[in-house]
Amino acid sequence: MRAALSTFAIAFVVVACGPLPGGGNAVTAASVAVQSSDLPSGMQKCDVSGDIDAYLAKVKAKDPTHYTTIKQEWDDAKSHGATAGQVAVYADTADHCAAFQSNSSDITTATFKLVVNFVIEFKDEAAAAKGYTSESILGFSPSTIKSSGSVPVTEGTKTGLSANSIVLTLELGGQSFYVAVWQNKKFMSILAVLNFDQATSTKIATAVNGRIK
């Protein structure tokens, strides 16, 4: 279970899309990713947040193993049609932001409130759908989420996100995990919410999904 979540945590990326119908504002990686307004008060945006290249530069020195893994997986994702990525990380204190940056490879060890969101933009919706259904994007595939066997998952429209979606929820050793991965239009979003109640976690995912136009 922890191995599956660790693999999943390696993989979060946000997107930039085309112009909204009837308006001049573009949907961007920054506008889709988790925002402070999506979260309960007190959560801090970690300095490691940013586009995927900036994220990699920031984690390289403190977690070289994570850097190498994500760099290889991001290069692979681009070969399958990914064109842009953004990472949003929030924690309940500045010290916990630093703890994440030093151990990004395994967020399952976090006993504090943590939100990590990667969203990927693909060249088109078909590439995004294939990324979700057929590829391992940034180390993720639906089978990875389901590999723990006994852990309950919800898939498809029942998640409230999209037809291509999967949500895992788990309480383990005093920790709570909410992991949602979904494809909507040109975007694939990977979201991990740790140590929040399920209603709050679902609200965060819904807010992110609602900004994909």
Go through the PLM ranges and name each one.
Residues S36, K45-D47, I52, I107-E121, ...:
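Long, low-complexity, Ser/Thr/Gly/Pro-rich intrinsically disordered segments that act as flexible linkers
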Residues G42-C46, I52, A126-Y178, A207:
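Short Gly/Thr-rich strand-loop-strand
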Residues V116, Y178-N195:
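Short, well-ordered beta-strand elements
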Residues G18-N103, V151, K203-R211:
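N-terminal "mature-domain start" segment
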